[in-house]
Amino acid sequence: MNRNNIAENPISQSKLPIERRRVEFTLDDVTEKYYYRGNPQVSAFFASLSVGFPPGEAEFIKSVKLFEDQITDPKLREEVKNFAHQEAHHSFQHKLLNQKLNELGYQTGGIDNVFKEKLARREKQWSPQRRLARTVSAEHITATWAHWALGSEEKMQHFPTSMRHLLQWHAIEEIEHKSVAFDVYQQCVGDRRLLNWVYRHFLYFEFPLSLTLTTRALLKQDNYKPTAEDRRVFKDFLFAKKDGMVSSLWPHYRAFTKQGFHPWALDDSGLVDDWKGTLSPYFAH
Ligand SMILES: [Fe+2]
Ligand SMILES: [Fe+2]
């Protein structure tokens, strides 16, 4: 793939159809508060990610739709609609998961409110261009995480099956639509300096800080003191050289600010094809 051509050609460069699916996960097997290997830290970390999805994804949709009228490429316009459909359904499914997590003892209401207030403030204070740049940034992090979720079975196998499949379905769709916000930005804004600045702020500051604070807040509800083994599992989960969620894909997180970058420079369409078959029993088209 010629990355320079992609950067110069400001229309849809998607590699996969962005499918509209309906899914159903019972979540009957999510029965423990510390559902991931009995580990409170990994479990709270994913609970806080899940709480962040519904407000976050609502903002992704809004910020892309702000530019809908300026999109000249009919393929990209159609993709925006399918992207919005997918993100809305992710939110719906994560709300069901969050409800389940609340039943298991996580009190997520306060965190949800903080997210919503922060986004409402930004809606008033930030320019549409900056909001779209943040969405493009978050979509790259999400798509990179999605690549990890589909390629790291050893780590993923410890989630309860239905929750693992929910996360992997979400991952498939994040990869399918990973270039939509980017292509909209390229066509309608095109300011790479702004984009790189917003991305660096998101990657090194906003995202890790927000996740650390929300994970800590959830753990504090139990007056939790981590054991050495808890710490080891959590550290391995994030930073194992071979398949850590952060460390193993660090070059892909960083690739974003390189000249000529496009989300499909990492072609993971094969991963999606492999997983679609496994998860198809959950899909009701
Ligand atoms: Fe999503
Ligand atoms: Fe997304």
Where are these regions (language model features)?
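Non-heme di-metal
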Residues: 2-285
